[in-house]
Amino acid sequence: MLRIGMLMSLLARAAALRPAVVHVNRAASTRRAAAADPFAENRAPIVLYDGVCRMCNFWVDWVLDNDPTAKLRFAALQSPAGRRLLERSGRKPDDISSIVLVTPDEAFIKSEAVLEIGKQLSITTPLATIAQGVVPRAIADAAYDTIANNRYNIAGKRSYRDSDERLAERFISED
């Protein structure tokens, strides 16, 4: 009985968190120069990931290997570009608590970001679509939070990721 109560409490807290979809703060992005807009010339979504997390970097490598048509671009949360995109998405620029998928019009966080990324990859589209329809967001986010909060204990840290020369166009400039 105690475990069910703990699970219900965890689900209630997860449901009370901010929504997984955040509309872009147009006022903040308007204040920036047009040259700083990563969507000015390329409207492909941008995945913001923890640049020092081994597990996160392994996952980025897997996505790169399974996205041959370059539907997604990447920026480390800790990079200047990542910090600007976090602000544009209504998040604090030093918030590295969640993966973020940023599109020209909205941003997705936590499990919703993972599922939206999965829908971009032909290999995982069916699974992501089914999971999004079947698994309640509160449960998916609770599972995401458990992994995210323990990611350094699970896989450790590495030095800040440098983009591969062959894939430079897939990573947002570190200007």
Question: Where are the regions that the model predicts?
Answer:
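N-terminal chloroplast transit peptides
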Residues: M1-V21
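N-terminal mitochondrial targeting presequences
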Residues: A16, R26-A36
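Compositionally biased, low-complexity peptide segments typical
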Residues: V22-N25, Y152
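Local sequence-structure signature of Cys/Sec-based thiol-disulfide redox active-site neighborhoods
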Residues: D37-D67
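A structure-centric signal for secondary-structure junctions around beta-strands
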Residues: R43-A44, K71, D95-I96
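N-terminal G-site of the GST-like fold
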Residues: G51, N66-K92
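Thiol/selenol-based redox catalytic cores and closely related redox-interacting motifs
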Residues: P80-D175
